[in-house]
Design a protein with these regions (language model features):
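Intrinsically disordered, low-complexity terminal regulatory regions
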Residues: 1-67, 155
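Juxtadomain coupling helices with adjacent low-complexity linkers
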Residues: 2-3, 17, 130-155
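Sensory-domain boundary capping and coupling elements
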Residues: 117-130
Length: 155
């Protein structure tokens, strides 16, 4: 499995950022482009969900892959909510071993959650699912972190 090419995704995000005049349209295009481009990298990415923080709740704003089961998640709940509550990215090699895992799909075996920030404040996250146990290497995490950082800067 290949590592995501962060520079390629970031280049497409920058191009997408220039396409829309209104800030709301531009933000939505950036969110959807992120989900589509990350998933387009292929295996191990089964589904990619992009949540934005709204108070104490994460709200789904874009996805690519399987239809989402959760349109919102409370901070502190599940892998996504834990990432925000702890302020740390989460790499869960085997979701079956995680006590607070919230099942989105019965085929999902692993999950990687990468936070993104605006002015050092958490504003959202990229939630990646895989049907493979333990597919996300440190290099994969680092590549996704670059994409998340770029997204935070562009939003």
């Amino acid at each position: 499995m290949a590592v995501l090419q962060a520079s390629k995704v970031i280049k497409r995000l920058k191009a997408a950022s220039a396409l829309k005049d209104s800030a709301a349209d531009r933000r939505q295009v950036l969110r959807q482009t992120t989900a589509d481009e990350v998933r387009a990298a292929g295996q191990p990415y089964t589904s990619v969900y992009l949540y934005m923080l709204n108070g104490e709740e994460l709200v789904l704003k874009a996805f690519s892959g399987r239809s989402p089961k959760h349109l919102s998640i409370e901070v502190g709940c599940g892998v996504c909510g834990t990432a925000v509550a702890e302020g740390k990215d989460q790499n869960v090699p085997d979701v079956a071993a995680r006590d607070n895992y919230i099942a989105c799909n019965r085929r999902t075996r692993s999950e990687l959650v990468v936070l993104f920030r605006k002015n050092r404040e958490i504003v959202g996250l990229i939630d990646i699912h895989s049907d493979v146990v333990d597919p996300f290497s440190k290099e994969e995490e680092a590549a996704l972190k670059k994409v998340a950082d770029a997204l935070g800067d562009l939003l």
